[in-house]
Regions:
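Phosphate-binding active sites in nucleotide-utilizing proteins
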Residues: 181, 187-238, 242-243
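Cysteine-nucleophile active-site neighborhood
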Residues: 218, 225-304, 345-355, 359-360
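A glycine-centered loop/beta-turn motif at secondary-structure junctions
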Residues: 325-361
Length: 374
C-alpha cells in the first residue's frame, strides 16, 4: 500500500497528527474518542454507539486478523458483527497490518472500509493522541488530506439526536411464540443483546426509540444501548415514566438504557471528560466486595446523587467512582452502564440477562437479589 495518501488529523484545539490513509479516501469530521481494547474492531466499528465518532485504537497493531464475513443467522441477526454496517465515522490506528490471517477472515480491514466508504488512517501516534484526549477531554477533529483544501466544517453535535438516526423505524420481532415477551427499545441496539435474550427463550419485540409501547401485550421491558446525548431522548424518557407509573413489569437497561431509566427516575446526566471505552473497566456491586471486569462504550454518566428516593446505585466504577448501574428498591427495575453481552470483551456480567429473564418468569415480583459468579 505504498500509494497511501498523506493525511492530517486536526483536533479542535489545533493539535495535529500526521499519518496515511488506508481506508476510504475522503475527509471527515467528528468527535475523536479512544478505545483501549486489544481486539474487537469488527464489533466496535459496527456498534451503533460509535455513530459520529472518529474511533482511536490504542493497541498498536490493527487489522492483522482481517474481517469476518457479513453473514446472517436464521433470526436475521448478523453472525459476526453488531449491526448491518459500519457506524463509526472513521478509525485511527498506529500500525495497520496489510497482511491478515484468521480462519474466519474473508477480506482485509482496508478493503472493508473502502467498500463501506469509511476513512481509516495509520501511522498516528495513538498513545500520544490518547494522552492529549485524556488530559484535555474528548475533542472534535477532522481528518484532512494533505493535497486537498480544508473544505469541511468542524463537527457540531449540539442538538443532534444520534439515537433517532440509528434506531429501527418499524417493529421487528424475533423468536416469535417462544414464551415470555420482551419489548426492546432500540436506541442503537447491538446484535448480541438481542441474541442473549433469544438464547434465554424469550420473544423479542424490537420497537423504535420513541414508540409508545405501554399498551402492548408484553411481560418485560428492555432498554438498549445507543449513541450520543441521552438528553436528546426525552420522548423515550417520558414513555418509560408512563410505563413505571402504571405497571411493575420487569425492566432492564444497558448503557444508554441505564441513562434513560435513571432520567425517568429523576436523575441528571453529565458528560464524562473522555468516556469509558474498553474491555477492562472494573466495577463493584454496591453492598458487596464483588468486582467484575466489564466491556464499556459510553461518554455520559448518571449523577447517582440525583436519583429519586426509591432508587439506589447497583454498580460503581472502581477507577473513577462513576455510576455503573441502578435499581429500584422495591420493583424489579435495574440497569447497567456497562455491556454484559460484551461482544467483544469479557462476559463476567452476563448473569444480568439471567436475572432479568428469571424475574420475567417469577410469579410475583420481589426485590432483586442479583447473583454473583465469584
Amino acid at each position: 500500500m505504498s500509494d497511501m495518501k498523506k493525511v492530517t488529523l486536526v483536533l479542535s484545539d489545533g493539535t495535529k497528527f500526521h499519518g496515511k490513509s488506508f481506508g476510504y479516501d475522503a475527509p471527515v469530521a467528528g468527535e475523536v474518542v479512544f478505545n483501549t481494547a486489544m481486539m474487537g474492531y469488527p464489533e466496535s466499528l459496527t456498534d451503533p454507539s460509535y455513530a459520529g465518532q472518529l474511533m482511536t485504537l490504542t493497541f498498536p497493531l490493527v487489522g492483522n486478523y482481517g474481517v469476518p464475513p457479513f453473514t446472517f443467522e436464521e433470526n436475521g441477526l448478523p453472525t459476526f458483527m453488531e449491526s448491518d454496517k459500519i457506524y463509526a465515522s472513521a478509525i485511527i490506528v498506529n500500525d495497520y497490518s496489510e497482511q491478515y490471517s484468521h480462519w474466519n477472515a474473508v477480506e482485509s480491514l482496508a478493503d472493508w472500509l473502502k467498500r463501506e466508504k469509511v476513512p481509516g488512517i495509520t501511522g498516528i501516534d495513538t498513545r500520544e493522541l490518547t494522552k492529549v484526549l485524556r488530559e484535555h477531554g474528548v475533542m472534535m477533529g477532522k481528518i484532512l488530506f494533505d493535497d486537498e483544501p480544508d473544505n469541511i466544517p468542524e463537527a457540531n453535535y449540539e442538538g443532534v439526536n444520534f439515537v433517532d438516526q440509528v434506531s429501527c423505524k418499524e417493529i421487528i420481532r424475533y423468536n416469535e411464540g417462544a414464551g415470555k415477551k420482551v419489548v426492546l427499545v432500540d436506541c442503537g441496539v447491538k446484535a448480541n443483546i438481542i441474541r442473549c435474550l433469544i438464547n434465554r427463550g424469550v420473544e423479542v419485540i424490537r420497537v423504535p426509540w420513541n414508540y409508545d409501547y405501554t399498551d402492548m401485550d408484553f411481560d418485560g421491558l428492555f432498554l438498549a444501548n445507543g449513541p450520543g446525548d441521552p438528553d436528546m431522548c426525552e420522548d423515550a424518557v417520558n414513555i418509560i415514566r408512563k410505563q413505571i407509573s402504571q405497571s411493575r413489569k420487569p425492566i432492564c437497561g444497558i448503557c444508554m438504557g441505564n441513562q434513560l431509566l435513571s432520567k425517568a427516575a429523576g436523575a441528571t446526566i453529565y458528560k464524562l471528560k473522555y468516556g469509558h471505552r474498553s474491555h477492562n473497566q472494573p466495577v463493584r456491586m454496591v453492598g458487596t466486595n464483588n468486582c467484575y471486569i466489564t466491556s464499556q462504550n459510553h461518554g455520559y454518566a448518571v449523577d447517582a446523587k440525583t436519583l429519586g428516593n426509591d432508587w439506589e446505585e447497583l454498580f460503581v466504577n472502581m477507577n473513577d467512582g462513576s455510576n455503573e448501574g441502578i435499581r429500584h428498591k422495591v420493583n424489579p427495575w435495574f440497569s447497567s452502564q456497562f455491556h454484559p453481552e460484551a461482544c467483544s470483551g469479557p462476559v463476567d456480567t452476563e448473569f444480568m440477562f439471567d436475572k432479568f429473564v428469571e424475574t420475567l418468569k417469577s410469579v410475583s415480583y420481589t426485590h432483586l437479589t442479583l447473583p454473583t459468579i465469584l
